[in-house]
């Protein structure tokens, strides 16, 4: 690199928009301005000039931001001067390794010296969201600017890899570094099935001080009313014998002839005694849990819910195994009346203030009593005891009796 080359480079830089800004910078090796070094032809070789040229441009780039005009003017000037210097250097020295690039004097093309290491080209902001990793658009900065984009405390900067080529499939890509988010695996424990919840039953009423005479339940909203409630504790013996399988050694005609001797209303529970005992234990345990929950005002526990499901499944199993329909084991005298805690009042209803007899009936009865007294005096000569003149129905209740 001679003095003529230095003067040509000086004239080209000074004609650029940001030339004076670069020439007056002192970020060189000897702490002199770049203009002074070019005028005095300090640089004997192109690598010496390129080293100071890069340091000066990096220093100025870090003094500005991408939104400033001088930031991009210096970036364009650095690229053009670096390209011109590289071409001049290739003409003089032929082939020379420079900054990791191999320059060919014939076609003046640059290729990467080491393709194994990924070359970072840009940066972006990265954050983890509810739907997976989120990336911002690439930051438009100069290659000389080593500052990372600032995302504050929300996002962090991340370097972006170049687009992978078809020939080299071993390069790291963004998909390999940050795979897409997958759905959360399902829970191993299955929650309670709402379809097994108990059906709406009878609603009990609170009438306050009138609980002794007012209705205590309302079955209009229940799925299974009182009249359709059936028991699976027993079944008709005749229906069981008709549907039961008969061994070949037994005469079927004898059984068929004796079916009429069985009492149609007879009941039996021997074959399902074990299931009934288990059902009774579950019902007792369920009643104990319900009483504890009602007295302590707690929410429905999982144990109580599971026991109710077991009771429901056991009842369905009994009905299915013995092929019973609701009409088969209907009990007419079965009641669903349950004990309900409420206000208790001692005493009786007040007496009726007015007798139930009409005045004409009362007058007729008085006259008959007087006639009886006169007959008794004429026969015995003395007054015999007789009933008082009190209406017979004066102590009857005026309200309807409770049942």
Curated annotation (Swiss-Prot):
Keywords: Chromatin regulator, Cytoplasm, Nucleus, Phosphoprotein, Transcription, Transcription regulation. The keyword Membrane does not apply. It is found in: Cytoplasm; Nucleus. Residues 376-403 are annotated as: Disordered. One of its GO terms (cellular component) is cytosol. One of its GO terms (biological process) is chromatin remodeling. Residues 376-389 have a biased composition (Low complexity). The modification Phosphoserine is found at residue 384. The keyword Transcription applies. Component of the RSC complex composed of at least arp9, arp42, rsc1, rsc4, rsc7, rsc9, rsc58, sfh1, snf21, ssr1, ssr2, ssr3 and ssr4. The complex interacts with histone and histone variant components of centromeric chromatin. Component of the chromatin structure remodeling complex (RSC), which is involved in transcription regulation and nucleosome positioning. Controls particularly membrane and organelle development genes. This is Chromatin structure-remodeling complex subunit rsc58. It comes from Schizosaccharomyces pombe (strain 972 / ATCC 24843).
């Amino acid at each position: 690199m001679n003095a003529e080359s230095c003067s040509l480079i000086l004239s080209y830089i000074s004609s650029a928009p940001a030339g004076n800004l670069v020439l007056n910078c002192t970020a060189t090796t000897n702490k002199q301005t770049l203009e002074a070094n070019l005028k005095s032809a300090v640089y004997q070789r192109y690598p010496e000039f390129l080293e100071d040229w890069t340091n000066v441009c990096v220093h100025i780039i870090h003094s500005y931001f991408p939104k400033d005009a001088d930031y991009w003017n210096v970036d364009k000037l650095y690229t053009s001067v670096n390209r011109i210097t590289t071409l001049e250097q290739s003409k003089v020295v032929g082939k020379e390794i420079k900054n990791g690039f191999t320059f060919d004097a014939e076609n003046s093309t640059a290729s990467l010296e080491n393709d194994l290491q990924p070359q970072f080209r840009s940066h972006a902001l990265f954050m983890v969201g509810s739907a997976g990793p989120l990336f911002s658009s690439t930051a438009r900065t100069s290659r000389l600017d080593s500052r990372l984009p600032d995302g504050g405390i929300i996002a962090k900067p991340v370097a972006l890899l170049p687009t992978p080529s078809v020939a080299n499939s071993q390069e790291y890509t963004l998909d390999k570094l940050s795979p897409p988010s997958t759905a959360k695996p399902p829970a191993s424990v299955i929650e309670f099935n709402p379809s097994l919840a108990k059906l709406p039953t009878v609603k009990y009423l609170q009438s306050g001080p009138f609980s002794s005479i007012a209705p205590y339940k309302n079955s209009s909203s229940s799925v299974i009313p009182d009249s359709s409630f059936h028991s699976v504790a027993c079944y008709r013996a005749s229906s069981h014998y008709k549907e039961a399988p008969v061994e070949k050694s037994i005469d079927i005609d004898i059984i068929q002839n004796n079916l009429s001797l069985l009492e149609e209303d007879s009941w039996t529970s021997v074959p399902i005694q074990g299931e009934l005992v288990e059902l009774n234990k579950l019902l007792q345990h369920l009643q104990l849990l319900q009483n504890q929950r009602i007295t302590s005002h707690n929410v429905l526990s999982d144990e109580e819910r599971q026991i109710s499901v077991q009771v429901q499944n056991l009842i369905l199993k009994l009905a299915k195994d013995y092929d019973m329909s609701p009409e088969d084991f209907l009990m007419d005298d079965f009641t669903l009346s349950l004990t309900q805690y409420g206000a208790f009042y001692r005493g009786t209803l007040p007496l009726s203030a007015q007798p139930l007899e009409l005045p004409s009936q009362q007058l007729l009865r008085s006259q008959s009593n007087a006639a009886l007294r006169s007959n008794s005096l004429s026969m015995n000569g003395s007054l015999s005891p007789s009933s008082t003149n009190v209406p017979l129905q004066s102590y009857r209740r005026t309200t309807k009796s409770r049942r």
